[in-house]
Amino acid sequence: MTSLNRNARELLAFYRDAGVDALLGDDAVDRFADEFDRPAPKTAASSPAEAFPGEQVPPSPSLARKGGGSSISAPAAIAVAPPSAEAAVMSARAAAKGAESLEALRALLQTFEGCMLRTTATQLVFADGNPKGRIMFVGEAPGRDEDIAGLPFVGRSGKLLDLMMQAIGLDRTQAYIANIVPWRPPGNRTPTPLESAICLPFLLRQIELADPDILVCLGQPSTQTLLGTKEGITRTRGRWFKFDTGRREIRALPTYHPAFLLRSPLQKRLAWRDFLALKKALAG
């Protein structure tokens, strides 16, 4: 009974800190129609033109011959075409493999030119927290606040993540935090499949170098990308998966992304269950 009372108090404290102030919402929520339950994206664009929209070279104007009605085409402008999807991903893999430390990996990403997001973002958002911590959280991509600060999860969703960690006795000195994509996509749009595929080798190397005991996938994109599943987050959250870091096999736990919880606060009760499972795993 004492254990049940303690868990109940912790749950109420979690709800209070997370901003839940009502037992029921104004509108009914269909929990089987989660907005993140969409098919897994393809791992690469079918062509460079699809991967890099808006970069087509305009057609060359025609030059009229003197004294005639026919025309000849002017030489086409020479443009540097973006690398093919396969070449871009292979380049990223080769570069990431050469990083022998997290510091070297960060420095490498600072100068890596294989991802177009680097040219539109304010700065690299590499990681935050303690790389020697037992747990590593991975989201999808930085937002506006993260782009400005140069750190992941510092906006509203980051504050909620901090509260969720605090509810089970954790803080950023005990956890390591990163994203699949380390640069903010323009307008906070979703990263393209090619952008995620190019950045993935760096994240995998980052996980290998940090070598956490437990990996927490925040949201569906992180879960599907890292765990190779096509199932939606409503089916995968709260389930333990195996993940090979390159050094050893560790446990991975998918859960809802804090940004989703801000939009769907009633789902926080399920996230709380996931974090209780995480707390138990860390204590074991």
What are these regions (language model features)?
Residues 1-17, 22-25:
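Non-catalytic accessory regions outside enzyme or core folds
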Residues 6, 21-22, 26, 30-31, ...:
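A polyanion-binding, active-site-adjacent surface
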